[in-house]
Design a protein with these regions (language model features):
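Alpha-helical segment of the N-proximal tetratricopeptide repeat
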Residues: 3-40, 47-51
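Helix-start (N-cap) detector for alpha-helical repeat units in TPR-like alpha-solenoids
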Residues: 5-6, 39-40, 73-74, 107-108, ...
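Register position in tetratricopeptide repeats
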Residues: 17-18, 51-52, 85-86, 119, ...
Length: 158
């Protein structure tokens, strides 16, 4: 049974790598039929749904994963990113803060929090979070690009 599950997850991963997300979902569903509480399958299923623009379904999958492991940092970041896309910035920040409570040096959570804060109109605070993210990982592209964008927005407003 475990071998079959692993094979399904590998096939789903390969399909995602090829951009065949719809077919990958079928494999994740089969994997979850075998092991309904498989956290990896839930997370990857959620990411795949997100890639397809099925954000509410992705959110449900992340919430299901969090019901199994409430403090899973990857799931919290993924849930936050979906909430951000859905323009639920305060809820997204809540997810990123939960990650930062466990790992204050998490560059992704810092940068994503900066993005949500920026969307809420607080560019100086957003810049602060992008800079913190870059202190944790100086090569983090998202933080670098977001920092430059936020600075340009501030400059154009002045």
């Amino acid at each position: 049974m475990q071998k079959k599950l692993q094979k399904l997850l590998e096939q789903a991963y390969e399909l995602c790598e090829d951009g065949n997300y719809v077919r990958a979902l079928e494999y994740y569903d089969m994997a979850l039929d075998i092991e309904p509480d498989n956290l990896n399958a839930m997370v990857d299923n959620g990411v795949t749904l997100q890639n397809l623009g099925r954000f509410n379904e992705a959110l449900q999958m992340y919430e299901k994963a969090l019901s199994i492991e409430a403090e899973n940092l990857d799931v919290l970041i993924n849930k936050g990113s979906v909430l951000h896309i859905l323009k639920k910035y305060s809820e997204a920040i809540f997810c990123y803060d939960a990650v930062l409570d466990h790992d204050k040096r998490n560059a992704m959570a810092l940068a994503y929090k900066g993005l949500s804060i920026g969307e809420m109109g607080n560019m100086p605070s957003a810049i602060k979070y992008f800079k913190k993210a870059l202190r944790m990982d100086q090569d983090y592209d998202l933080a670098q690009i977001s920092l430059l964008t936020a600075k340009n927005i501030l400059k154009n407003v002045s």
